[in-house]
Amino acid sequence: MERTDIQMKKVLVLEDESSIRSFIVINLRRAGYDVIEAETGEEALEKLKENPNTKVALLDIMLPGIDGFEVCRRIRATNSKIGIIMLTARSQEMDKVTGLMTGADDYVTKPFSPAELTARVD
């Protein structure tokens, strides 16, 4: 279903692997989302400052520089309303608990389907 400009939800995708980031971005755009891309945690935080109306942030955990857990903490310190979804290959229970305790609303492990991703972002 295509969205009108008024309905379009802005989503930040933080993923350092370009092929995975492209897969996520293509599928979200096909679903009608306005997507902002970031390759590092620092870049993601800067893009969120530039785009304060972002509704959802998809965060990988394993990144160069600051990791996704720290990005999540920093986002939550300044924005309690944005939806945060950890999107990672790390599937251990402790990682999931850490993600949720740092402020994530959801935790999705790779691999995932485009349909699952879109359903969680909605």
Predicted regions span which residues?
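The short loop immediately C-terminal to the conserved phospho-acceptor aspartate in CheY-like receiver
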Residues: A57, I61-M62, R90
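Charged docking surfaces used in two-component/phosphorelay signaling
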Residues: S22-R30
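Conserved acidic carboxylate
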Residues: E15, L63
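The feature encodes the CheY-like receiver
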Residues: P64, Q92, K110
